[in-house]
Amino acid sequence: MIEKKNESIKEIIEDLVKKLTKWEHEYYVLSNPSVSDEVYDNTYRTLLGYERKYPQYVLSYSPTQRVGSSISNKFIKVKHDYLMLSLGNCFNFEELLNFNENIAKISKQEDNPYVLEPKIDGLSISLIYLDGVLSEALTRGDGVFGESVIANIKTIKTIPLKINTTIKKIVIRGEVYVSNQDFEAINASRDEDKKFANSRNYASGSLRNIDVSEVAKRKLNAFFYYIPNAYELGFETQYQVIQQLKEWGFNVAKEIKLFSNIKELYTSLKELENNKNKLDYRIDGAVIKYNNFKDYEIIGYTSKFPKWAIAYKFAPTQVQTQLKDIILNVGRTGKLTFVAQLAPIELEGSIITYATLHNLEYINDLDIRINDYVYLIKAAEIIPKVIGVNLDKRPNNAKKLEFDYNCPSCHQPLVKKPEEVDWYCIYDQCKQKQLQYLIYYCSKPIMNIEGLSESTLALFFNTKVNDVIRECNELITNQNVSEDLSLFKLLDNEEQTFVNSVLDIYQLERYKEIIIKPWLKKGFSKSSLKYNFRFQEKSFDKLINSINESKNRELYRLLAALNIKYIGIATAKSIANTYHDIDQLKNLTVEDYMRLADISSITANSLFSFFSDEKNWELIEQLKTLSINTKDEINNDLVDSSSIYYDKKFVITGSFSISRNDIIKKLSLKYKIKFVSGVSKNVDFVLAGNSPTAKKINQAKVLNIPIIQEEIWNK
């Protein structure tokens, strides 16, 4: 009898969940409710009553499970099942036609079907459903790893907690955003100095709020548009995916359309651009996807984005404001940058007060003067940029920039190569250059030292150790201490700051006592101190742990961190994929560097110059003494030395189903293959993907070099 009663209660709960889920979809997604708010609220309360009485029957996808007031997020990093790649850009019809021509080479037809989608200006999200139940939600992160925000995602009522599918595991991607109407209402209710800069930042910040109950109040929404492995799951076209997402109850942008050719699509695309301000959500362009999945693998990918889709960037909105001043800054490489300080102006949903002026030549060519009224756009919808001057409004007090060709920080003479437009400070002791380099070194993409923000680094960089010691000793002398304490000994070097170089970062722990001052008398206010670093013992220990963790970063990060001209993360990865120990770079020639994949002669010369300088090797040796990792460990158990590919030289050309960097890394580790950039008699194999360079293929044939056209990295 009890079993029957329990079965009946279970069925009642399931029926209530089914009803409420249907009504939520009608109200939040379709904007067409079939029941009144009163009916919904009463049913919700009824379900809540049953769930409290019979918690063993609570369903994970019940509407009551969207918000748990006691939940807090930890934002654990999780690897994506499929890379979250960015998209290539185009800006006009001609570039769109070029995109179509590349597709046509594969499809063998002039007219190709495309899906046009609005490019939502929000935060990318990847949902994972297991047996139809929402189980995980990840942000884009770096495209390889994202942060889990599942608790916060569940608060968005347009996202179904359960979908009707027999697929065991499915990944569904979309964009979290806030409507224009809701964003304006939210900002209207806030004080002037607490208003959100733009809707995208608001959505991003909300989704990363640790308080789930607070997120539930944020009025977030989401659109969905993509299943990364749709073809494997039996879908044949992108438009079929869109229709299925609608059927499953996902919010899908009404503006998504299917076209039989690129010219038809372009007409509708321009209509979308002209009407973008009439939408109740912000878009920064449109996405064009080739509709037929069967050709995707053949069309392939670059190292950064798929070649079967492209983002069309709309012409930027132009506004006018007054240029109040021109600020000169020195970057980590010594490059001088020119920044316009502006009268605040709203542009594309953001309040703009600064914009780039590129370089001195740009300023002179446009005759930009302080106090001028200038035209402003967002370059690629992100970076504010001054594009011209309203000469009709030029005021009498407009004045040209006084440029004395000296560094604004150290006042040493600037230099410029005849073939370049940028001016550089080459003085090694330039304070601003040193600080910018330290900020770069500690940044997330490089050595990823959490706790050393720009402001904290600036404080450590500018504060003399002896000044802090004197303040501490004064506190001890005045008996503002909780224990008997000897005076701290002054350093011999009066000019020594806490962090003057990257080496000092790894020795910060020795200053713990004078930084956090745990010996201060209880109740003493640190706010009265002249030198207050705002660290408690726990936060300082966390910083030291992060510094120690940075010692074990991958080799490519260290290579990028060495501040070598023209060397960014992509080039550093290319080097580390071939040479797994920094010491191997000591005796390389320019030609050796040029043989590496994707490295130009300019970059090769820069690398050769850096690693030929004994001063730089002194720094590397000092880093080694501090236990900084300078090599990638190779697991010899995974190396296949019996393969015909072992220890051979390869040239890679064309596009592949995964990025070229990933291929190079896998093959370098598995077979110790060395990748070079050009085909010569010294090359053993050419690995060719889709649309390989004809010249390289022809050279390989002439030299009888075997051409591989299979995925040997998966063997």
Curated annotation (Swiss-Prot):
One of its GO terms (molecular function) is DNA ligase (NAD+) activity. Pfam families: BRCT, DNA_ligase_aden, DNA_ligase_OB, DNA_ligase_ZBD, HHH_2. The active site is at K119. The keyword Magnesium applies. Residues 640-715 form the BRCT domain. It catalyses: NAD(+) + (deoxyribonucleotide)n-3'-hydroxyl + 5'-phospho-(deoxyribonucleotide)m = (deoxyribonucleotide)n+m + AMP + beta-nicotinamide D-nucleotide. Zn(2+) binds at C407, C410, C425, C430. One of its GO terms (biological process) is DNA replication. NAD(+) binds at D37, E38, V39, Y40, D41, S86, L87, E117, R140, E175, K289, K313. It is an enzyme of class 6 (ligase). Keywords: DNA damage, DNA repair, DNA replication, Ligase, Magnesium, Manganese, Metal-binding, NAD, Zinc. Its cofactor is Mg(2+); Mn(2+). CDD domains: BRCT_DNA_ligase_like, LIGANc. InterPro entries: BRCT_dom, BRCT_dom_sf, DisA/LigA_HHH, DNA_ligase, DNA_ligase_CS, DNAligase_adenylation, DNAligase_N, NA-bd_OB-fold. The keyword Ligase applies. Its EC number is 6.5.1.2. DNA ligase that catalyzes the formation of phosphodiester linkages between 5'-phosphoryl and 3'-hydroxyl groups in double-stranded DNA using NAD as a coenzyme and as the energy source for the reaction. It is essential for DNA replication and repair of damaged DNA. Belongs to the NAD-dependent DNA ligase family. LigA subfamily. This is DNA ligase.
